[in-house]
């Protein structure tokens, strides 16, 4: 596991117990943006999070991060508590199951029908297989995608 993955896992271990219903921890990212290191914690709730929610969550999470010993952060960082946005990542099977009926973007480790990217409506997620309806030029098609082939999945905005 590389240093960034280790930091993300340490943060997840201490932050997950602090984030309680109705909030849900969606994702954690740590990386450089410009010259600054940013720790982004993506949180959501059913009706969406507000600016006040992010402020309250920051006050809860920041002191907890200071308890991690030894300090895993090699340099100073900015803490960002944010919404996952319209293109929310689908990082778990539960998240994918919750996206049935929605328009999603899926990247694959290995091509299916000579395609490694599909964007369309998730019709079903059963027995570790996604069933998606997508447009191939002007025709609607359906594809079955084994979950094990999914490298990245997220909600998508249909234009």
Curated annotation (Swiss-Prot):
Keywords, ordered alphabetically: Cytoplasm, Ribosome biogenesis
RNA-binding listed as a keyword: no
Subcellular location: Cytoplasm
Keyword flag Protein biosynthesis: no
GO process annotations (BP): ribosomal small subunit assembly; translation
Superkingdom of the source species: Bacteria
Transmembrane segments: none
Any one cellular-component term (Gene Ontology): cytosol
Listed NCBIfam families: PRK00092.1-2
Function: Required for maturation of 30S ribosomal subunits.
HAMAP family according to UniProt: RimP
Similarity remark: Belongs to the RimP family.
Protein name: Ribosome maturation factor RimP
Origin species: Streptococcus pneumoniae (strain CGSP14)
Gene coding for it: rimP
């Amino acid at each position: 596991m590389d240093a960034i993955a280790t930091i993300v896992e340490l943060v997840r271990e201490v932050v997950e117990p602090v984030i309680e219903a109705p909030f849900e921890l969606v994702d954690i990212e740590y990386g450089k943006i410009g010259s600054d290191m940013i720790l982004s914690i993506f949180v959501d709730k059913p009706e969406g999070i507000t600016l006040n929610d992010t402020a309250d969550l920051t006050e809860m999470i920041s002191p907890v991060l200071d308890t991690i010993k030894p300090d895993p952060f090699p340099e100073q960082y900015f803490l960002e508590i944010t919404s996952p946005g319209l293109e929310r990542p689908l990082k778990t099977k539960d998240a994918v199951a919750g996206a049935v009926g929605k328009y999603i973007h899926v990247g694959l480790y290995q091509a299916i029908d000579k395609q490694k990217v599909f964007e369309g409506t998730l019709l079903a997620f059963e027995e570790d297989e996604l069933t998606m309806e997508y447009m191939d030029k002007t025709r609607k098609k359906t594809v079955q995608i084994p979950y094990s082939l999914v490298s990245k999945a997220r909600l998508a905005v249909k234009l």
